[in-house]
Each structure stands twice: as C-alpha cells, then as structure tokens.
UniProtKB/Swiss-Prot annotation:
Function statement: Protamines substitute for histones in the chromatin of sperm during the haploid phase of spermatogenesis. They compact sperm DNA into a highly condensed, stable and inactive complex.
Keyword terms: Chromosome, Developmental protein, Differentiation, DNA condensation, DNA-binding, Nucleosome core, Nucleus, Spermatogenesis
Gene Ontology cellular-component terms listed: nucleosome; nucleus
Gene transcribed to yield this protein: PRM1
Domain of life (superkingdom): Eukaryota
UniProt similarity note: Belongs to the protamine P1 family.
GO-annotated molecular function: DNA binding
Alphabetical GO biological process terms: chromosome condensation; sperm DNA condensation
Protein name (record): Sperm protamine P1
Tissue: Testis.
Cellular compartments annotated: Nucleus; Chromosome
Organism phylogeny: Eukaryota, Metazoa, Chordata, Craniata, Vertebrata
Amino acid sequence: MARFRPSRSRSRSLYRRRRRSRRQRSRRGGRQTGPRKITRRGRGRGKSRRRRGRRSMRSSRRRRRRRRN
C-alpha cells in the first residue's frame, strides 16, 4: 500500500497547481467578494513564484557560462 501513496500525493499536487491558476483568475475578477483573503493568499503565491523564477534564472545563467567557457 505504501507504493500507491506517493503516486496519489503527486497527482493531487499537480491538480492543486492547475486549480490554483484557475482560481486566481476568478478571484482577481471578483475582489468584491473577499479582498482580505485575496491579499493574503496572493502574497504567498507571489513569493513562491518569485523564488521559482529566481532559481530558473540562476540555472540558466550557469548553463550559459558553461557554454561560453
């Protein structure tokens, strides 16, 4: 049974990421329903996205340097 648990958790994480992108669009359009929740969740998601972007930039820069050398 332990083998099936990681596969389920991975599939759930992928579905959650897809659902969050859709929910962000709907929440941005409907700020009147709950502005406080949007600011709190939006800030956390923005930070995670910025960190991921920085990591990708660092990896791309390292690859470029290796190619030049």
